[in-house]
């Protein structure tokens, strides 16, 4: 699922705080470069924060990663709540969810899915905070399961997992092949599939 992490809304002309800028910069760099290639110095430079100030907010790279996971979690919950608020029927909610898949197709084709890439990388780390990443990926699956259950589907969990697998697989292919149209094609097929339920 795509998302956009930025600091909290501020008054016009007011810059987000250092911690918010660090988390937003970390999310972007982890997405673009990956965990292993991203250093605390890279994050500080991208956030326009003196490198020494990073340690005031985060003692380790793992603390930064935890903050990025928390920010992604907040963004996913916010996106799902907005879909719930704007769409009454489960089918329309699922279709809106699918539209979210293609909202940043160019970025996904260039760098992969922000959530999928992060969760995949964390799953490979020896000292991994994998549980938090798994919980992050479960958010949209659990939400989709609720929608399928509202449609009276007894196989709601399997359908929700299939939906996320279809997106993440399409995101991987779009990124590998550098072709954002893979995501829009997958979205069309998913919408037709939702109509058949």
Task: Cite the ranges covered by each PLM segment.
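Helix-turn-helix
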Residues: 21, 25-63, 67
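Hydrophobic alpha-helical connector segments
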Residues: 67, 81-111, 160-163
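Hydrophobic/aromatic-rich alpha-helical bundle segments in the mid-to-C-terminal region
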Residues: 115, 126-138, 149-197
């Amino acid at each position: 699922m795509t998302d956009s992490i930025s600091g909290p809304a501020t008054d016009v002309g007011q810059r987000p705080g250092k911690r918010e800028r660090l988390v937003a910069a970390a999310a972007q760099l982890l997405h673009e470069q990956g965990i292993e290639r991203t250093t605390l110095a890279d994050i500080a430079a991208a956030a326009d924060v003196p490198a020494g100030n990073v340690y005031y907010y985060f003692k380790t790279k793992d603390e930064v990663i935890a903050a990025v996971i928390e920010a992604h979690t907040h963004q996913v919950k916010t996106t799902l709540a907005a879909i719930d608020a704007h769409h009454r029927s489960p089918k329309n909610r699922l279709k809106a969810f699918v539209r979210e898949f293609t909202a940043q197709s160019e970025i996904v084709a260039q760098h992969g899915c922000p959530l999928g890439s992060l969760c995949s990388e964390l799953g490979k780390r020896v000292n991994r905070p994998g549980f938090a990443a798994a919980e992050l990926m479960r958010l949209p699956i659990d939400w989709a399961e609720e929608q399928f259950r509202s449609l009276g589907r007894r196989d709601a969990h399997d359908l929700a997992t299939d939906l996320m697998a279809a997106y993440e697989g399409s995101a991987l292919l779009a990124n590998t092949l550098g072709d954002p149209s893979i995501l829009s094609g997958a979205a069309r097929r998913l919408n037709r599939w939702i109509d058949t339920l």
